Design a protein with these regions (language model features):
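Short, well-structured N-terminal submotif of metal-dependent ribonuclease cores
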Residues: 1-51
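Short, active-site-adjacent cap segments at secondary-structure transitions
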Residues: 24-25, 57, 130-132
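Short, flexible loop segments at the rims of nucleotide/cofactor-binding pockets, characterized by
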Residues: 26-28, 98-104
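Short, flexible helix/strand-to-coil boundary loops that buttress conserved ligand/catalytic motifs
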Residues: 28-29, 63, 134
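Short, hydrophobic alpha-helical packing/hinge segments within bilobed ligand-binding/sensory domains
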Residues: 38, 111-112
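PIN-domain endoribonuclease scaffold, especially VapC-family toxins
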Residues: 41-46, 50-98
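Short secondary-structure boundary segments
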Residues: 53-54, 126-128
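Acidic, PIN/NYN-like endoribonuclease modules and their adjacent C-terminal/linker elements
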Residues: 101, 105, 109, 116-122, ...
C-alpha cells in the first residue's frame, strides 16, 4: 500500500481541491495536456490536493482496469506521482456535519463527503452525476463542483 506524503506548502493558503478519479486518470495516466495546468498548480503548491483512503483506493483500483492496459510499473508510477503531492485527510470523528445532496451514483458520494469534511474549496470532476449537484442549495457555502475546464478559468 502506498503511503501518502505529508506535504508542506509555501503558499499562505492554497486552494483546497478534491479531484475525482476520472480527473486523476487524465492527469496521471494520460497526462492530458489540456489539464496540465491543473497538475502544475498541485505540484507547485498553489492548490492542495486532498484525498482519503477510500478515494485513493478507488484510483488504485481503476488503474488496474483492463481498458487502460497499464503495466504494474505504470500503475505504480501514477500512484507514486499523485501520492507525492496529495494531502491525506484522516476521517473526522463522528459529529453532526452539513447535509449533502445524494449523488445518483452512490460510488461518487465519497467525493462529496470528502470535500465537505476536508473543507475543500472545490470538487473537480467530469462526472455527470456529480456535476448535476453543482447548483444545489445544500452545497452553497461548503464547496463548489467544477469541471476541469472551469477550474482552469476560475482561478
Amino acid at each position: 500500500m502506498l503511503a501518502f506524503t505529508e506535504t508542506a506548502f509555501s503558499c499562505a493558503s492554497p486552494r483546497r481541491v478534491v479531484l475525482d478519479t476520472n480527473v486523476l486518470v487524465s492527469l496521471y495516466v494520460f497526462e492530458d495536456s489540456r489539464f496540465a495546468p491543473l497538475r502544475a498548480r498541485i505540484e507547485s503548491g498553489e492548490w492542495q490536493a486532498i484525498s482519503n483512503e477510500a478515494c485513493f483506493e478507488e484510483f488504485r483500483r481503476v488503474l488496474g482496469y483492463a481498458m487502460f492496459a497499464l503495466t504494474e510499473e505504470r500503475q505504480q508510477a501514477a500512484l507514486a506521482a499523485y501520492g507525492a503531492v496529495v494531502t491525506r485527510f484522516a476521517e473526522p470523528p463522528a459529529v453532526a456535519a452539513a447535509a449533502l445532496p445524494r449523488c445518483a451514483d452512490r460510488d461518487d458520494q465519497k467525493f462529496l463527503e470528502l470535500a465537505r469534511d476536508a473543507a475543500a474549496d472545490w470538487l473537480v470532476t467530469a462526472d455527470k452525476a456529480l456535476l448535476k449537484l453543482a447548483r444545489r442549495d445544500r452545497l452553497r457555502g461548503l464547496f463548489r463542483i467544477l469541471t476541469p475546464e472551469r477550474a482552469l478559468t476560475d482561478v
